[in-house]
Amino acid sequence: MNDAKLKVRACVFDAYGTLFDFASAATGCRDVLGDKTGALTALWRDKQLQYTWLRGLQGRHADFWQVTADALDFTMESLGVVDAGLRTRLLDLYRTLRCFSEVPEVLKELKQSGFVTAILSNGAPGMLADAVSGAGLGALLDHVLSVEQVGVFK
């Protein structure tokens, strides 16, 4: 087989859990959550993914922001955390999740090596724009692609 056909030209990443630390929202509320921080993070993420799978199977798409809020509501109720202000704070923090510490340098090295860099995510376009901007990654990404254009979670 011709080596030119095998040449990698682009590196495409998932956003949440790969570039952005979804745990950073709950960690940012540790002052209120205390020892429930880890449990909230784990259950919120599990429900978020489960809701995307269920919606896909049922053909009932909703954007990832709605799924994220629904998963948080379930999680807070399950953990007995009833606090509208905390809910708002968690969702605000989720829109601007921290990226993992190595991400900027890795993306920079990939760009300098000539690779096209991109995100392909379940995230809604606005969520992704906020996360990329908040983490200062805009200049390091060539494309930010959301499943919203096709209306089906990956």
Region spans (language model):
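Active-site neighborhood of HAD-like aspartate-dependent phosphohydrolases
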Residues: 1-49
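A metal-dependent, Asp-based hydrolase signature
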Residues: 32, 38, 52-89
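Hydrophobic packing residues within well-ordered alpha-helices of enzyme cores
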Residues: 26-30, 103, 128-132
